[in-house]
Amino acid sequence: MKATKITYKKDPMGLTPAQIVNELNRFIVGQEKAKKAVAIALRNRCRRKRVEGNLRNEIVPKNILMIGSTGVGKTEIARRLAKLTNSPFYKIEATKFTEVGYVGRDVESIIRDLVEIAVNTEKTLAKTEVDINAREKAIERILDSLVGKTSSSETREKFKEKVLNGELNDTEIEISVADTAPIGGGSFEIPGMPGSSMGVLNLGDMIGRALGSSKTKTKKMLVKEAMAIIIPEELEKLIDQEKIIQQAITLAENDGIVFIDEIDKIASAPSSGAKNAEISREGVQRDLLPLIEGTTVNTKYGQVKTDHILFIASGAFHIAKPSDLLPELQGRLPIRVELNSLTKDDMIKILLEPETSLIKQYSALIGTEDVHLEFTASAIEKIADYAITVNLEVEDIGARRLHTILENLLEDISFEASEMKGKKITIDDQFVENQLSKIITNLDLAKFIL
């Protein structure tokens, strides 16, 4: 049955586990055990916040290990859960990290990135609260440039109305704006660490800005361009940066969700003989231990405790097994959830049922060209059939196979849609077979195309 959006009875602790599962059902097909596990984990967070006294600090989240092939919904469940609660969410592959002392990223960067996301979330929220005030101040600065600071209130009102109506959008003005040039004299990449850089700082600029003497420069620009620059400037002035940082740290510590994908890739399979690789993998696992158990990480915003951050790890575990992880790490991921491989019925449901299903997405895209796309039930079944066949014969990538199949199926229509305005195109099983049968039957070709 198709999941629909429901208005729930207000609960003082937020959504109940059943309501969370129902919300996830709107976007994700099947995997009830995984949905139930994350729903309980989320509800327990709310329960913990209502526990009195010192006991609250002793209650830690039960971290989750999801086991299942790629494309079965592991990442999507965690991502939708974070959206549902407006929690800071950070996804990273375990293979991105190396043991401390080796070249590469260290695991503490997970928390630094999570806090950065939390700060941006809090900043966006704070800006919406002062948006009207910031716009008013921006308009006043525009008026100062247009009619001067000493102009009469009557003149300012007339020009203000014109600014609001957009009549003066293309009028050129001269206005002072913040100098956004970076502090210092450029940067250089740190050898052996791609993507990282070290800046050369200008001490005079730094001291000047620290004392509040931020630089401005006068520029000529159109009114509409000035508004786009000045509003963000005024927003930054109105929000309390220190308060935002404190709220962001609290948000990350109590509501943060970290999703570590491909954790099976750092497990040490007994059959593998590469000793150097094993040392590095085991080192990453050991570095993850304190982070998941609870430690304090230094960030540019201050110290962040990881005790109550929810960690969700996932992996396919085709070669290694969960028992190949370090025993200590296994103990810190007490909830194990195995996700099922997708069946033909699951594929059909994925194509049709979610609110943002692939069929709805493609129909909406082609619909922008005034072309009506319609899929018959037999066509949907055929697409699901082909997806399962290729997954079995080539490699099982789960629901992601549907993306490649639909792209190939609709390639000609997408290319020609702009010349087909007003037309209705019906995709039936015969159309699907004509477009894809040659590729499906030639497995060597399917490996490269699908």
Swiss-Prot record:
User: Native species of this protein?
Assistant: Rickettsia canadensis (strain McKiel)
The record describes the protein's role as: ATPase subunit of a proteasome-like degradation complex; this subunit has chaperone activity. The binding of ATP and its subsequent hydrolysis by HslU are essential for unfolding of protein substrates subsequently hydrolyzed by HslV. HslU recognizes the N-terminal part of its protein substrates and unfolds these before they are guided to HslV for hydrolysis.
Q: Which family does it belong to?
A: Belongs to the ClpX chaperone family. HslU subfamily.
Q: Which GO terms describe its cellular component?
A: HslUV protease complex
The organism's taxonomic lineage, starting at the top: Bacteria, Pseudomonadati, Pseudomonadota, Alphaproteobacteria, Rickettsiales
Query: What protein name applies here?
Result: ATP-dependent protease ATPase subunit HslU
**Origin superkingdom:** Bacteria
Write the record's keywords in alphabetical order, separated by commas: ATP-binding, Chaperone, Cytoplasm, Nucleotide-binding
Tell me, which GO biological process terms does this entry list?
protein unfolding; proteolysis involved in protein catabolic process
Any single GO molecular-function term of the entry would be: peptidase activity
